[in-house]
């Protein structure tokens, strides 16, 4: 029996999984989700299509003039803010494997010429993910490996993706 100042415990909050809420985004970005998922599989790195849909939805949610223009700052914002905000607004769990999915998605964009030529080169975009704990293979960095020097918010003055692709670097 509860005393006069005691209240019964609140029921636990149960958040839906990403799979339970991502359906509309998968439909909206169907072509990109299918193409990226197939590309990842062909690279020997199968990926959950829901993670690709989440990236696409988070990019689309932010008002951007050019969704194909990628910079280190944009990758950092997507990873640290946009994906988390999308999950918060959808009231679902934020997936732990988003860094690896973004690594693969950026590779897909570069390999299929879907990066704006003015984008930072793929390796510089992936620096943000190295800073966030991935190794050079796009998988979590093993324990004991040195941290990656963060330059996510420093101005980038090197060649663009277009210059790298054209061999003009």
Describe these PLM feature segments.
Residues 2-29, 34, 38-41, 90-94, ...:
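Long, charge-dense low-complexity segments
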């Amino acid at each position: 029996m509860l005393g006069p100042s005691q209240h019964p415990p609140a029921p636990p909050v149960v958040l839906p999984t990403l799979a339970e809420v991502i359906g509309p985004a998968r439909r909206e970005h169907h072509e990109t989700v299918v193409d990226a998922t197939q590309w990842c599989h062909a690279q020997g790195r199968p990926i959950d299509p829901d993670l690709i849909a989440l990236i696409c939805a988070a990019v689309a949610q932010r008002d951007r003039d050019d969704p194909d223009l990628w910079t280190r700052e944009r990758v950092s914002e997507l990873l640290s803010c946009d994906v988390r905000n999308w999950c918060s607004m959808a009231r679902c769990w934020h997936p732990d494997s988003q860094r690896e999915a973004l690594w693969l998605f950026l590779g897909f964009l570069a390999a299929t010429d879907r990066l704006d030529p003015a984008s930072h080169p793929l390796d510089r975009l992936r620096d943000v993910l190295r800073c966030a704990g991935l190794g050079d293979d796009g998988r979590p960095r093993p324990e004991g490996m040195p941290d990656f020097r963060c330059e996510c918010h420093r101005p980038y003055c090197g060649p663009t993706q277009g210059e790298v692709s054209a061999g003009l670097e």
